Amino acid sequence: MKQTTQLETGAEGTPDVRAGDKPAAGFARRSRPSRQAAYEPDEALSSYAAPPLQPWEEDAPRSAQPPAAPSSTLMPKAAKRMVILAIVWLVFLLFVSLKPAHAAPEAGATGETANGARASYQLHCAACHGTDRLGGIGPALLPENLSRLRKGEALKVVRDGRPATQMAGFGQALAADQLAALVDWIYTPVVPAPVWREADIRASRIQHTEPAKLPARPVFEADPLNLFLVVEAGDHHVSVLDGDRLEVIHRFPSRHALHGGPKFADGGRYVFFASRDGWVTKYDLWNLKVVAEVRAGINTRNLAASPDGRHIAIANYLPHTLVLLDGDLNLLKVLEVSDRDGKHSSRVSAVYDATPRHAFIAALKDVPEVWEISYDPAADEIPAGLIHDHAQREGAFIPGYLNPRRTQLNDPLDDFFFTQDYAELMGASREGKGQVVNLDARKKIADLPLAGMPHLGSGITWDWRGRRVMASTNLQAAEVTVIDLQSREVVRRIPTRGPGFFLRSHENSRYAFVDSMMSPEYKHVLQVIDKETLKVVHELTEQPGRTLAHVEFTRDGSYALASLWEDDGALLVFDAQTLTEVKRIPMRKPVGKYNVWNKIMREEGTSH
């Protein structure tokens, strides 16, 4: 199996822009100088085809004259019986050997199914996906890594392969029941659970390019701060889009199943990606080259980067670790994640950079704690255990640099949102419990009146009637919740078509765009909210059954780019004032797009 992918399909269709209320006059737009180059991929993936099945060899020609029968005087009756038995046995063995390799297993052979699937895997899949299923040139095939891929889609990929990839189909080599058994097997946990140690991380590092040998200036004419990186999950590529001309200037292959949140650093020159298989990639956006890669885990949630790009944090589900790297992707430290007493291990839900605090903030999935890991070498020491006197330093302390400060809570957090000063975070759990945590006092200070499953990590802020408000989608309820950040009261619940995932705006726009991608009936609809009236004023629609989601604005807020999340998808470019479509750029399932300026400046209308 070469490079199994998350396969999504959608029907073809044409856009249908449905008018709502008349759009209001827009805000003043910022102006900036506008500054494309053709590209060639750095390295094309070689095509792969499974070796053809070898026909059985025909029997060798036999002599026309049969051999003379042995003399009875030389062969006793017992010997004759043994010869006959031997001939019968040879005929049986010949029959078994000629039985097709894909024959269905005998009835009652269910106990051998796993062994058969394991044998099929080692024969057809291990060369690319690893003998231990941890991945190689193909992705890891573990339940954690396949959680976003339905078994039916996985079966289709294994049977038919994936066009334009190294993943060949095995429908001719394996029978239907063998294919089903193989897919079932890769969705079963590995026992004992796989590990990924410090030595594995160090050994996996690949240096592709020496940064010192590259020019310290962009090799293209576009504004480097108005570039978009577009993650195309359809064929595992990333496109670099000029935000002024709205044209692709470069496209390069990525690791399998990138997480949708690349992180920019060093003024936007470098960007760091994380794949679901744990691969971290450093990319030089000015020179359009991959610099280095390292595998930091087996199943990874996301990564965070300090603004100068000198420290990188990777949140893992498998193993239960938080991995810290330097800017060249060399290992600094692996933090084994567990509660304070070391009794309960935990996955890491997410990690984000808190720039004013010179620290990473991580939420734990299985333990009710939030960690703050300072990347300031001069950080204050952290008390360890009982401290009799802080002033006199009576007690045990550990270095504050790259060690966790723990905030213990009553409930774990799956998602969170920083206030503007990064002194507090607003978090939510899968059970719909919201809370406010003060990172300086390291304790919960308030509850949030949230229901359903709010997606606070996608929250945005703006000023409304003299108050600073935050708005968030909800993964279970058809609404956008608007909260006063001072009083922490809900000021409005805005009804939407269905549960949504992404909410986006820009400080130069009076509009916020929200999807309903969690709704099967309305995932093709984008709704536009007026940030002054807190009402839906417009709808943008695609053909039902397709998914329209994830908006990102250009640097000055002039245009809003939305993703048509299909393998034959596109970026839809809308005028941010008139809300009319001005351009459509074909893409292979563009799951996300990220503007350099908006990310490095922590623009209020986007997540960070």
Q: Which role fits each region the language model picked out?
A:
Residues G243-R245, L285-L288, D326-N330, Y375-P377, ...:
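Short loop/turn segments that connect beta-strands within beta-propeller blades
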Residues R217, L258-K263, T300-A304, H344-Y352, ...:
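Repeated scaffold domains used in trafficking and secretory/extracellular systems
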Residues A127, D132-I137, L141-V191:
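Extracytoplasmic electron-transfer domains, predominantly the class I c-type cytochrome c fold
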Residues F501-G569:
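Loop/turn-rich, solvent-exposed surfaces of beta-rich toroidal or solenoidal domains
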Residues E247-F252, K289-V294, L331-D341, G400-T407, ...:
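A short beta-strand motif characteristic of beta-propeller blades
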Residues D223-P224, D266-G267, P307-D308, T355-P356, ...:
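Residue-level detector of Asp-centered blade-edge/turn motifs that repeat once per structural unit
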Residues L335-K343, P377-A378, I382-L409, L448-M453, ...:
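Surface-exposed loop and turn segments in beta-propeller and other repeat-based domains
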Residues A107-N115, Q122, A168-G234:
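Flexible coil segments in periplasmic/lumen-exposed cytochrome c-class electron-transfer proteins
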